[in-house]
Amino acid sequence: MDYIQEYVKPVDPEVAEAIEKEEARQNNKLELIASENFVSRAVMAAQGSVMTNKYAEGLPGARYYGGCEYVDIVEELARDRVKEIFGAEHANVQPHSGAQANTAVYFAALQPGQTIMGMNLNHGGHLTHGSKVNISGKYFNIVDYGVNRDTERIDYEELREIALKARPQMIVAGASAYPRILDFKKFREIADEAGALLFVDMAHIAGLVAAGLHPSPVPYADFVSSTTHKTLRGPRGGFILCRQEWANKIDKAVFPGIQGGPLMHVIAAKAVCFKEALTPEFKAYQQDIVNNAAILAKALMEQGLRVVSGGTDNHLMLVDVRPKGLNGRDAEAILESINITVNKNAIPFDPEKPTVTSGIRVGTPAVTSRALKGDDMRELARAITLVLDKHDSEEVKEEARRIVKALCDKYPLYT
């Protein structure tokens, strides 16, 4: 990128070199990490703008600093657009991350020591849904639910039984590694029966929800959180949607509760991202993500890999690599050696340690942003299975690298 050469390199050549190498890495490798994506140039430019210079504690029209008239415009645009996308009553776009958005929801609605029921991390949940190493697991009493051993899908009757026994104050629906549709209507019914609030973390599926390709949680949930940088294809950040009755508590939980000044350059980029998400092109892009995931999952299964739950309904899949005599850690390293990036990931009822795992998580948002489709995904599956089958063969690795290079050359980034 020319501006790195022009502005950064003369001042800090070490940082400039690292940025240039990262740009080359993104260009020359195929990104299959489900939580990563490539923003548009418009989003990137907004995030790199003079908005980074402005402090703006508070909310539009009620700041603790002067000179906020233009950052107010940007934040209002971001709030209005995200409410339009999801049909929400209230939005707060200030959370710096999905984790901070989730923490704000907990502290807006609960008292320390109350009970949260969330999806088990080892079954596809997220750290912020009650893991003992996270603040959510330290401040609150956690009860978890998971997937059925046979179907590897959420068993809603079992979930109901756990909820009625535990009587949590809040049920969290959402996941970081669950490839199937979430039934928010059932979650709502269970929450009502158990006397619990319903909080949905839609970080992974927000883009699909925006495009109407996954049921929306907004009509059912008391609170909805998300990141902006996964399927939404925006900057790294978070937001919260809620019913109007919770608006004041949510806003106060974000500021001054867990954050100080908002990152106005990031909020500007969020506003641009939300405008892009309102276009027909964005909906077509989300359909391509889902189609690509289905094609890739089918191709991997046809070539001897086991995909958890037998496929995917969304943008990601969990691949059990044990049929190839591998663990997730080794599979991740092998694929990295041919310029495909994935992450090792636990599969349900995984006998391996979290640092080893039996599977890998594979997602299609980033490769879809590069415009890969159909036969490209089948070629990608061929490269993956070639090298996992014969990972000790340098000849096979070279063949797989040629497949990856051809796809990268065909679909360059930021041309």
Curated annotation (Swiss-Prot):
Its EC number is 2.1.2.1. It comes from the Bacteria. Pathway: One-carbon metabolism; tetrahydrofolate interconversion; Amino-acid biosynthesis; glycine biosynthesis; glycine from L-serine: step 1/1. Coiled coil: none annotated. It catalyses: (6R)-5,10-methylene-5,6,7,8-tetrahydrofolate + glycine + H2O = (6S)-5,6,7,8-tetrahydrofolate + L-serine. The record marks 229 as: Plays an important role in substrate specificity. It is found in: Cytoplasm. GO terms for cellular component: cytosol. The modification N6-(pyridoxal phosphate)lysine is found at residue 230. The keyword Amino-acid biosynthesis applies. GO terms for biological process: glycine biosynthetic process from serine; tetrahydrofolate interconversion. One of its GO terms (molecular function) is glycine hydroxymethyltransferase activity. Its main location: cytoplasm. PROSITE patterns: SHMT (PS00096). Catalyzes the reversible interconversion of serine and glycine with tetrahydrofolate (THF) serving as the one-carbon carrier. This reaction serves as the major source of one-carbon groups required for the biosynthesis of purines, thymidylate, methionine, and other important biomolecules. Also exhibits THF-independent aldolase activity toward beta-hydroxyamino acids, producing glycine and aldehydes, via a retro-aldol mechanism. This is Serine hydroxymethyltransferase.
